[in-house]
């Protein structure tokens, strides 16, 4: 999901090299503007205080749309669906997906950074362990990171407290499918092993992505996302399509009707915003004026 240095957002003047996370969307039949805010799951909540126009965007919108409705995701029945999707088939164990040497390497890393024995995860899909390991790495290496404080959740909570509608661009089922079912188990296993054998690189990339986000530099964030090391650990085009680009296109199809209904604050991961196939460009191609907000 993160990979080749390329200059982006020099595509047109309206989406020029701006260091912004908040964007205004107007025109194309909208009576009042909507806004798009990019988030980052490793960033502290304090980033919102550095975006001076954010309160204006909050005040001028009547609903918040995120990737998911976070309250829905936390319902017991949906938590159960996610837990089930994380489990390996009955005839497969985690250990069976690796050589003994590979398994031992991963076990040592999991013990070091997560403080648990890998044997406890023997029925979990590798993708689920990779996600948990990434959180553990972030907690050890990123100052101020608190997995219990997420920007996406904060925006939805504020909207609910103000009596505004909260909506989601995707279903829980779709996100679960992307996370745990879009890759073969052998590919998930390889990516877990890649993470375990490239811990320093993983931490460095997370740090640089978070620094780029805190600088509100979408250009740099995209460049880091597209970096490649030219081996099997690199994200494939198909994986990027599943994780980023197909979702961008789907959101861009939904948003005209949503924004027409009411002025909307759209809150999605910042990695979805920049580039030729980014959400900002897709909205602009539909005839909207897309402007950075200070």
Question: Locations of the language-model features?
Answer:
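Expand to "…catalyze enediolate/carbanion chemistry for C-C bond making/breaking, isomerization
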Residues: 19-21, 276
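N-terminal signal peptide c-region/cleavage motif recognized by signal peptidases
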Residues: 14-16
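Structured, acidic catalytic/metal-binding patches in enzyme active sites
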Residues: 21, 27-34, 40-235, 239
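Hydrophobic alpha-helical segments, principally membrane-spanning helices and signal/leader peptides
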Residues: 23-24, 254
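Positively charged n-region of N-terminal signal peptides that target proteins for export
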Residues: 1-4
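A cross-kingdom marker for long, charged
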Residues: 234-294
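Short, linear, compositionally biased motifs with a strong N-terminal bias
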Residues: 10-11
